[in-house]
C-alpha cells in the first residue's frame, strides 16, 4: 500500500471513530494484553525485521492501536498492580477535542488508593 492510500485509510478510520465516539464520553480498555514486560523484550534489535517486530508490538498492546492510527485522545493510567508490584494500566479514550475529561479522570484515579502517595523506590550509585 502506498503512503497516499495508507493516509486515506487512516483518515477514513478517524472519521468513523469520531462518529462512533459521539455516543460515548469515554471508552475504557486495558492498556496492555499482559502484565508489563522487562525492559528490552520488544526492542527493535538488529536481528529483528520490521515484519517480525510489528506483530510483537501489536500483540502486546492491541488496545492502543486504534487511538494511535486515528489520533484519538487517549491516556494510560495505573489502576491495579501485578503480583510483582508493577502497575497495570487502563486506557481512557475520549472524543476528539475533549482531552480535559481524560485529565480529570486520571487526576481522580491518582488521588485514590492504592496510588495516592505511592512513589517508586529509586537508588543512585
Where are these regions (language model features)?
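Structural helix-boundary/capping segments
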Residues: 3-4, 8, 15, 58, ...
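Serine-dependent amide/ester hydrolase catalytic core
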Residues: 1-69, 120-124
Amino acid at each position: 500500500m502506498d503512503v497516499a492510500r495508507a493516509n486515506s485509510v487512516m483518515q477514513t478510520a478517524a472519521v468513523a471513530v469520531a462518529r462512533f465516539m459521539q455516543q460515548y464520553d469515554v471508552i475504557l480498555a486495558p492498556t496492555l494484553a499482559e502484565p508489563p514486560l522487562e525492559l528490552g523484550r520488544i526492542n527493535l534489535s538488529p536481528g529483528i525485521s520490521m515484519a517480525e517486530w510489528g506483530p510483537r508490538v501489536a500483540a502486546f498492546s492491541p488496545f492502543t492501536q486504534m487511538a494511535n492510527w486515528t489520533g484519538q485522545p487517549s491516556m494510560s493510567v495505573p489502576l491495579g498492580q501485578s503480583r510483582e508490584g508493577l502497575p497495570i494500566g487502563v486506557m481512557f479514550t475520549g472524543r476528539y477535542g475533549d482531552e480535559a475529561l481524560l485529565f480529570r479522570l486520571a487526576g481522580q484515579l491518582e488521588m485514590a488508593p492504592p496510588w495516592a502517595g505511592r512513589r517508586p523506590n529509586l537508588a543512585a550509585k
